[in-house]
C-alpha cells in the first residue's frame, strides 16, 4: 500500500492493486495535463493537473460508498456493496474517468470544435463527450489487460467504460455512474474545492464531510437526507460562483481561445500527432507548448509571454449573446479570415436540471426544487468574450458592426 498526502483530502491510501493502474505510463501522463487549461495565466497557482484530481475522485468514490451503505441500510437493498472487489472496481472507474483528456483538458476540446466549425478540418469531435469517448478507447488500448487481470469476477472493462460514458445497463453500473457523474458526484466534489484552493479563492469550499455523510441510494437513485439541504444549496452555489468568477473569467476565456486557435493551426499543419489512442502517450501539455511557436509568432507571444492580444472590454451578454449565437456563421468567417487573430469565445453553463437532485424526506423522494427556495433562483450563465491581436486592431469593422446590434 502507498499513502499520498493530498492538499484537499489529506492522506489517500492506495492499494497495491490500484497502484498497478496508477503506475502505467498512460495514467502518469495525466501529471502533464492541466486541470484548468491556461487559467494559471490569470490565477498563477492553478498549475494542478488531472493526475491529482483523478486520485481525489477515486478517494471520494470510496468515501461516498462507505456512507451510502450505512445510510441506506434497512431502506434499500444494496447487496453489491458487500463485495469489496466491486467497491474497488467502482473506485477504478472514478480513477479513470478523465483518462481521455487531451492536452490542456477542455481547451483542446474547444480547439477541436473550432478546427471543425471554423476551419473546416476533418477532426474527431463529440462535444462534451469527447474526452470520455476517447477515454473509453484509451482504456481498451492501454489498460484492458491489467483491469481484466485485477478484476476476474467481473466484466470489468465494459463496466468501467459504460460508467464513464454514462451509459449504464445494469443496476450496479447505474449506481456507479450516479456516484461518478451526476449533479452531486465525486467528480464535482473534488474539482470544486481543489480548483478553489489552487486559485486562492474561497468560492469552492464546500462542507464535503457533511455532504458525504448525508448521501443515500434509494429507488436506484442517489439522494441526500433532508438535513443535507443547506449543504446541497452551498454545493450548487459554490459551483455557480466558481463558474462565474474562475472558469468563466473573461481573461481566462480569452487565453483559452488563443490556445484553441493555436492548436487548430498545429492540427492543420500536421505538427502534432493525430488524435488517436495509439498516440496518447505523446499528447501532453509539454508537446503543445513546444510546438506553439510553429503555430505563429502572435500565438506564441500571447500564450508564453502574455503579450499582443487584447480583449474588447464589453462582454457579450443577454440579448447580445443571443444575437451573436444567431450570427455564428459570420463570426466564424471573421475568425477564419483573420486566421484566429480575431477571436470570439462563448461560455454556457446550466447550474443543474430539476430531474437531477433529490432529497429523502418523510420516507419519500422529492425534487430539491420542491424543498429549496434558493435552488429555484439559480440561472444559466451565458456570455461571450471578444479578443484580437494588436496587429489587426484596424480590422475590427465587422465585429464592431455586430456589436452595434447589441
Segments the model singles out, each with a brief description of its role:
Residues 1-92, 101-406:
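Histidine-centered, transition-metal-coordinating active-site segments
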Amino acid at each position: 500500500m502507498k499513502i499520498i498526502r493530498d492538499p484537499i483530502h489529506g492522506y489517500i491510501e492506495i492499494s497495491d492493486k490500484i497502484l498497478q493502474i496508477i503506475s502505467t505510463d498512460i495514467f502518469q501522463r495525466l501529471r502533464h495535463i492541466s486541470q484548468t487549461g491556461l487559467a494559471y495565466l490569470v490565477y498563477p497557482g492553478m498549475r494542478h493537473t488531472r493526475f491529482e484530481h483523478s486520485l481525489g475522485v477515486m478517494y471520494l468514490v470510496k468515501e461516498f460508498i462507505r456512507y451510502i451503505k450505512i445510510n441506506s441500510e434497512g431502506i434499500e437493498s444494496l447487496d453489491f456493496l458487500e463485495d469489496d472487489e466491486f467497491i474497488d472496481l467502482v473506485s477504478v472507474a472514478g480513477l479513470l474517468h478523465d483518462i481521455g483528456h487531451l492536452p490542456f483538458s477542455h481547451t483542446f476540446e474547444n480547439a477541436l470544435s473550432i478546427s471543425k466549425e471554423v476551419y473546416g478540418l476533418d477532426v474527431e469531435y463529440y462535444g462534451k463527450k469527447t474526452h470520455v469517448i476517447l477515454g473509453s478507447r484509451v482504456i481498451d488500448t492501454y489498460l484492458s489487460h491489467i483491469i481484466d487481470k485485477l478484476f476476474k469476477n467481473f466484466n470489468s472493462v465494459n463496466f468501467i467504460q459504460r460508467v464513464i460514458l454514462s451509459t449504464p445497463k445494469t443496476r450496479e453500473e447505474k449506481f456507479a455512474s450516479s456516484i461518478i457523474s451526476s449533479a452531486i458526484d465525486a467528480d464535482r466534489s473534488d474539482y470544486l474545492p481543489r480548483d478553489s484552493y489552487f486559485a486562492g479563492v474561497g468560492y469552492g469550499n464546500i462542507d464535503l464531510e457533511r455532504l458525504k455523510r448525508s448521501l443515500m441510494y434509494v429507488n436506484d437513485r442517489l439522494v441526500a437526507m433532508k438535513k443535507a439541504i443547506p449543504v446541497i444549496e452551498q454545493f450548487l452555489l459554490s459551483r455557480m460562483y466558481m463558474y462565474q468568477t474562475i472558469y468563466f473569467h473573461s481573461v481566462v476565456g480569452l487565453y483559452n481561445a488563443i490556445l484553441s486557435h493555436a492548436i487548430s493551426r498545429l492540427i492543420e499543419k500536421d505538427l502534432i500527432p493525430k488524435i488517436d489512442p495509439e498516440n496518447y502517450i505523446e499528447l501532453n501539455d509539454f508537446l503543445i507548448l513546444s510546438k506553439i511557436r510553429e503555430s505563429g509568432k502572435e500565438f506564441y507571444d500571447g500564450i508564453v509571454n502574455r503579450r499582443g492580444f487584447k480583449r474588447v472590454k464589453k462582454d457579450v451578454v443577454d440579448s447580445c449573446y443571443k444575437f451573436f449565437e444567431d450570427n455564428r456563421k459570420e463570426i466564424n468567417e471573421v475568425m477564419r479570415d483573420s486566421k484566429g487573430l480575431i477571436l470570439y469565445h462563448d461560455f454556457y453553463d446550466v447550474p443543474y436540471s430539476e430531474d437531477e437532485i433529490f432529497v429523502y424526506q418523510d420516507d419519500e423522494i422529492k425534487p430539491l426544487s420542491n424543498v429549496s427556495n434558493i435552488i429555484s433562483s439559480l440561472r444559466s450563465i451565458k456570455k461571450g468574450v471578444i479578443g484580437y491581436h494588436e496587429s489587426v486592431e484596424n480590422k475590427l469593422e465587422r465585429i464592431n458592426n455586430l456589436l452595434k446590434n447589441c
